[in-house]
Amino acid sequence: MKSTEQKIYGRNACLSFAKSSPKTVIRAYCTEENRGRLGSLLKFLASQKRAYHIVSSDDLNKICESEHHEGVCLLVERMQPGDETQLLKDLQAVPKIGSNLLLCLDGITNPHNLGAITRTAAHFGIKKIFLCNIPVESQKSLVSGAFHRTAEGGAVHVELYCSAEGKSALEALKKQHGWNVFATSSYGRSQSLHKISFPQKLILVMGSESQGVSDSILQIADSKVCINGTGHVESLNVASATAILLNEYARQKENYRSAVSRPTAIPTRAVRAEGRNRKGS
């Protein structure tokens, strides 16, 4: 496998990728049981004179270096996250009205957490994830086969961006474009999630389970948010915490939409009074 290529495995991940980006598929491997599910992709590969192989599950274990392939593996052109410059450029095109959220993951590199969070983001319609404070040597391995399998196809609906830093980009979005930074924290003056009103242009920062949100980003946060619990455990898994926060964001966003689109009712008494005035005129 070349450095410009990567393997994606897992049925939902492969089917979503094959549907959205068939031209980037170099080669396909699948068991006989999954041949029908990949029918359109296999026909496309054959028309482009690209190879596909029907193999046993044991062979796929070796190809994927994992037993969690669900009978399907694709060799594709490597997906690389965008950088800070691309993030700022893309966010300038975001509509100025309505609710917008940028999900920022601070120092999170575990592929299973990243995949689970990406799946959740896709479910709630979040379009962009910014991975910040990621060491350069770790950036190339973030978008792995394990990441795609855990994302269950969500990765094709979410754009990823990555930086070894992150504070400067968030500051630029705050000062130049009016975004608000909300960071999760269990310490200090954190507000309960259920008492928070999310702004229309929101950067939601999630920290790693071992380190939390970095001090440099906490310093520029407009608000700190916590999820109240029993205290029996120190914290939630970051993927679980993200799901809870995004659900609350989606709830507030839906309420905002309903309030904006709901027609204003004229009180009954006012209508009657208006009618009497017309009769007397």
Feature annotation, model-predicted:
Residues E33, S57-D59, I134-V136, E209-Q211, ...:
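Short, acidic/turn-prone active-site loops that include or flank metal/cofactor-
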Residues S16-K19, K23, C30, L91-Q191:
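RNA substrate-binding interface of SAM-dependent RNA methyltransferases
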Residues M1-A93, A259-S281:
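N-terminal positively charged helical leader segments and presequences
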Residues G10, D106, N113, S235-N237:
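Active-site helix-initiating loop/hinge in glycosyltransferases
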Residues L15, H123, A146-G154, D215-P267:
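Structured adenosyl-cofactor binding patch, chiefly the S-adenosyl-L-methionine
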Residues F182-H232:
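Active-site/ligand-binding-proximal alpha/beta "capping" segment
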Residues R37-L38, V136-A146, Q211-I217:
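Short, glycine/polar-rich helix-capping loops at beta-to-alpha or helix-loop-helix junctions
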Residues S56, E77, D106, C132-N133, ...:
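Short beta->alpha connector loops at strand-helix junctions that form conserved
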